[in-house]
């Protein structure tokens, strides 16, 4: 004859307190890691922006060497196949926010250089417009 409830197997698992401790540890780790992750994203945006500006300035210079004048618009660089498409400013997330710098007197064309139209300061401490 069996005794009721005497042979109930011991249940195995985690207690509520153990689960809460683990969740607290995970939350603590996230609060330490999240700011570093966000800073690294900002640094990456600055790096991509600086590289986009460097490449665009080189392309404008190449256009000037080839044609003897500076381009009248960024779209002209695409139309003449110096660019496949206008690059996106990673800070403003738009290809329409570039600030165009005109050449000095005596030069033909309208774009000597360009800057970012993004406001604010990059993680390096420089203004985005000064990159």
Map each language-model feature to its residues.
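Regular, well-ordered alpha-helical segments
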Residues: 31, 39, 46, 58, ...
């Amino acid at each position: 004859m069996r005794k009721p409830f005497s042979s109930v197997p011991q249940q195995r698992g985690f207690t509520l307190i153990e689960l809460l401790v683990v969740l607290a540890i995970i939350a603590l780790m996230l609060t330490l890691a999240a700011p570093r992750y966000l800073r690294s994203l900002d640094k990456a945006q600055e790096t991509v922006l600086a590289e986009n500006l460097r490449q665009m300035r080189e392309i404008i210079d190449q256009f000037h060497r080839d044609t003897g004048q500076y381009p009248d618009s960024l779209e002209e660089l695409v139309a003449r196949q110096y660019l496949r498409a206008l690059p996106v400013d990673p800070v403003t997330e738009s290809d329409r926010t570039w600030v165009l710098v005109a050449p000095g007197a005596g030069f033909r064309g309208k774009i000597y250089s360009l800057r970012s139209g993004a406001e604010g300061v990059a993680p390096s401490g420089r203004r985005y417009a000064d990159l």
